[in-house]
Amino acid sequence: MAATQDYKPGDIPLEEQDDRRLFCKYHYKGVLIVVIPILLGPMFLGHPIMIYRFMYISLCLLLYYILNLMARGAVAFIYITFIPVLGIAGSKHVSISYYTDLIFLVYGSVMLGIMMDSSRLSERLAMRVIAFVGSSLKLLQIFLAISVIIMTALINPTIAAAIWMKVAQAVITEYDNAGVVKMNSEEKRYEVGSKPYPTRPVIGIYITCCYSATLAGCLSPFVNPNGVISSSFEGDLPIGKLLMIMAGPAILGIVVMIFWIQVLFLGLFGGSVKRDLAELDGNQNNFKATIAERKLALGPWTIYPILALILIIIACFLAATRKPIIYMGWDDLDNSIESGLSVPSIGMAILFFAIPANYYFCKYYVCRQPVKEGTANSLVSWKAVNNNTPWGEIFMLGAGFAAAFCSQASGLNAYVADSMKEHTGEGSGTFKFISGALYGTLLTMLSPATAVCRLSLPTLMKGGSTFSLPLATALHNQFLLPISTPSNTIIAGWGNIRPFQFMLAGSVIAIFMLIAIAGMTAIISFS
């Protein structure tokens, strides 16, 4: 943090270099920022005009984001400026689309995770995890996958990913301190003073948390987008039938995910990662002693982590019982007003700031001086929240919601639905089915599935069930970018994982899920 606070632009100049051939090494980002909009310029000649304008600005935003050409927080607001300028939608509606109910769920989940760190609850839970898995990264990955899957299926994927990501970070920190895993790479950072990039094994552990949450969400009758998809089809796709479609792909997807991440990030079949981990094997002998010392340093549980754990349990209970689809929840008591997940998550976050972390002040009320004097700080401070919230990634998630809104406002969804409706003749059913599966995967790559279901699915359903049903089930395929789902956003922000790394990790899983979901949809729905 000191490096971030002390650094000013110009303090650390670029390395001097006389070799003109290295121009691209130092300036390619600036060149691409200018070249990409120029190369995509011919799209303005396309028709319908508004659709091609939306596609143009979306491609520019996506390429800037994936190629890391500028700060993510700046890229996120491209829609706010250019969507009104291009005449697609007014600035008021675009701005509102950035701040949805799910964004505040993310804020609440982030504050919950930061409270875990402030109270050192994450460290205490990490010790319990280490006692079970030891120093094995592969066992840690499987343990985290199972834990996230259970919590997601019963509560919520975003909350589950946030909680277990903090535990995973605490475990990795202990591994790093013990010398059995190297946490941070030596790769040059995008900005001077910014967080270091994680090593490949660490990326694999972190990504396991969000991918497990996404896959478990496919199987749960308690969480969206399952509920929104089922209600959109008005009885033609009951929640039980939807879960039957998703059960096989999700279970097999978990196996594929664990295997692929172990191959790519944990050195299952050798490579540089396995060699790097082998070099640290010599520190295994001191691992148990180091962990034992850390347990002694933590000491017994105090009121601070106990309070944090109690509030987390209450938050999970409120989220799980809000609107669980298969039985009446507390939000169903008043059908005139919907209380989204932002209500319990932000409501509990307010308590994080209101409830004191210690009770020294109580003794003053009975005229007794406490043994250890001090102020009554809250469970989490705003400074900690401000410093540890991944603002740029959350703003990019807002851009994902805006993309779903703008695809509707530009007429893209209506155009696609009309095209599918008009496509008749021999083989049209197969074409529509494949197109629906591919288009659904594309939409959920750019926007969270729940937003697509609420904003785009009603229009796309006009293209017929042969198109809309595979599209709807394909919306569970949320692996390719941090903005694909809120759990991806949180893990990418806290773990400092870049978009291209998500695309690399999610490519095989996304292809498998595309084929598996489409296959099960065809077998169960059209047989």
State where each predicted segment sits.
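Transmembrane helix-loop junctions in multi-pass membrane proteins
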Residues: 41-49, 87-92, 318-329, 358, ...
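Hydrophobic alpha-helical transmembrane segments
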Residues: 31-32, 55, 77, 103, ...
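Juxtamembrane and boundary regions of transmembrane helices in multi-pass small-molecule transporters
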Residues: 2-17, 22, 28-34, 38-42, ...
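Membrane-embedded alpha-helical segments and adjacent helix-loop junctions characteristic
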Residues: 15-20, 73-196, 376-379, 386-464
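Hydrophobic mid-bilayer segments of alpha-helices in multi-pass membrane transport proteins
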Residues: 26-39, 50-88, 101-111, 163, ...
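Interhelical loop segments of eukaryotic multi-pass membrane proteins
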Residues: 52-56, 77-78, 91-96, 101, ...
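Transmembrane alpha-helix interface/packing and boundary motifs in multi-pass membrane proteins
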Residues: 62-71, 147-157, 211-221, 353, ...
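Interfacial loop-to-helix junctions that mark the boundaries of transmembrane helices
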Residues: 19-27, 45-53, 64-65, 69, ...
